[in-house]
């Protein structure tokens, strides 16, 4: 089922191993009894306020613990030096591809329909903001009579990309 979701989102060349590497969480399987009764009665959360995109600080900090504290030019030099190691370079490319696949999934999945509202005839994307993705998922897994409480960034409430989420 999860692999089919990736294919539906336009990502067709993934193997089962590739899908497993993304560690998908299958809500219906994990909470079958909750789904059978209509969804969760209450959802409380503080979702991440990041975007689904490659982040060199996340990756290169594994090889240089001071990477996050370095200035921009020092980060560039350190990254260049680290990428001289073929294993690190291959891992960086793999990490970037993995993040691009995740972004493509969220952009193409029918499960996330509230992420690119139409404003004055133009589609406004949100760069796969995790807080907005989590909020849309909360709408899906909540029962009709449930309470949802989330700590969210202001862009959800005032940004153009949050329009469909607010109207939902």
How would you name each of these model-derived features?
Residues 2-168:
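SAM-dependent methyltransferase catalytic-core segment centered on the flexible catalytic loop
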